[in-house]
């Protein structure tokens, strides 16, 4: 579900939005507004459009690359949370209070500090003041590319293969929240959701479409879905779904089509595709609707990892049998071995020099 709507009436507000973005970038480019450079190297992962590029799996990919050598903190806004002010996320937190994506990251990587704060500069200053033995050695800043109040050591811009920012327009006519030329500030561009059947000529054509600078690398990532996994821990696991099972797929994410395609590939008998808004907070009515879908012994509900974080807090409202029929598809992203090595080298160099001499 893309946010942009190509309604001609939205052209005027899109022009005004683009003008405002241009003024803001000009003020930073000319030094009239100042960014903050942290003493801790910051790896920024973001995009110039809203939603649908898979930022969280790429944050997790970077964590996997770095966690054996550095103490890591993830800094995120915690979009959609009801909690106010800064927060350190724990594995037992409620997604409604800290955000679904921060909770997902913390549950996967308990050793990583996950810090939620909309004020990125304040958050970095807080992390800098931690005792030396606990202070992170690198901060991965999620969805922070447009936040120029922070100067990263290394910036990564994500863009979807089937909807690159070069073919987009400013919000609300399109989905751009920053000028496409802002991508020049990034050291790397990752093209996400690259189809498995892409030929070398397709990749070269995409590289030709992107306005790459000499100092920029481009990478192509692919989603890797795992097997359907029970969402709730239970003493009495239920039967696993089979390709013949009757499946209802539920997604409250920015661009659910890739997820739905995978569910239909794994389970050809998928009957229902239910779409909610990104970060949708599940309520009693939603839960009742979902419960009705899994009353039959051969019915299962499969959702995304991110939705799963929001559903966990409703465990007490479900019977053990119902909990056993709710699963999620874990997702990671992969690069080719050659690109993975190159990307890792660039990250380590940026961390070592805190962004200098890239």
Feature annotation, model-predicted:
Residues 16, 56, 105, 142, ...:
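Residue-level signal for inorganic ion chemistry
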Residues 25-91, 196-197:
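Walker A (P-loop) phosphate-binding motif
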Residues 2-3, 68, 150-157, 161-358:
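ATP-dependent carboxylate-amine ligase
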Residues 78-214:
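Phosphate/Mg2+-binding loops and adjacent switch elements
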Residues 1-40, 343, 350, 354:
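A transmembrane-helix-recognition feature enriched in membrane-embedded lipid enzymes
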Residues 61-65, 142, 262:
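Rossmann-fold NAD(P)-dependent oxidoreductase module
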């Amino acid at each position: 579900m893309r946010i942009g709507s190509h309604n001609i009436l939205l052209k005027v507000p899109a022009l005004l939005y683009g003008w405002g973005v241009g003024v803001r970038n000009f003020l930073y480019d000319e030094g009239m507004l100042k960014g903050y450079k942290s003493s801790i190297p910051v790896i920024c992962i973001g995009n110039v459009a809203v939603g649908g590029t898979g930022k969280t799996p790429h944050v997790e990919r970077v964590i996997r690359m770095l966690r054996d050598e550095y103490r890591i903190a993830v800094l995120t806004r915690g979009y959609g949370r009801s909690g106010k002010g800064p927060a350190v996320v724990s594995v037992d937190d409620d997604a409604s209070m800290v955000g679904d994506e921060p909770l997902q990251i913390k549950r996967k990587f308990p050793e990583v500090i996950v810090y939620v704060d909309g004020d990125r500069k304040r958050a970095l200053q807080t992390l800098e003041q931690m005792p030396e033995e606990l202070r992170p050695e690198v901060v991965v800043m999620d969805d922070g590319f447009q936040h120029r109040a922070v100067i990263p050591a290394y910036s990564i811009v994500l863009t979807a293969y089937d909807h690159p920012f070069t073919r987009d327009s400013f919000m609300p006519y399109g989905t751009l929240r920053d000028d496409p030329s802002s991508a020049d500030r990034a050291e790397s561009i990752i093209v996400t959701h690259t189809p498995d059947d892409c030929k070398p000529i397709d990749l070269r054509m995409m590289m030709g479409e992107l306005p790459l600078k000499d100092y920029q690398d481009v990478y192509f990532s692919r989603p890797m879905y795992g097997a359907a996994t029970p969402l709730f821990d239970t003493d009495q696991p239920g039967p696993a779904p089979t390709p013949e099972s009757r499946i209802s797929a539920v997604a409250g994410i920015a661009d659910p089509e890739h997820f739905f395609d995978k569910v239909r590939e794994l389970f050809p008998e998928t009957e229902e595709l239910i779409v909610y808004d990104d970060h949708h907070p599940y309520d009693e009515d939603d839960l009742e609707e979902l419960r009705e879908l899994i009353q039959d012994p051969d019915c299962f509900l499969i959702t995304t990892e991110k939705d799963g974080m929001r559903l966990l807090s409703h465990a007490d409202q479900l019977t053990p049998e119902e909990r056993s029929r709710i699963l999620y598809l874990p997702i990671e992203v992969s690069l080719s071995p050659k690109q993975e090595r190159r990307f890792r080298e660039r990250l380590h160099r940026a961390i070592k020099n805190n962004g200098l001499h890239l």
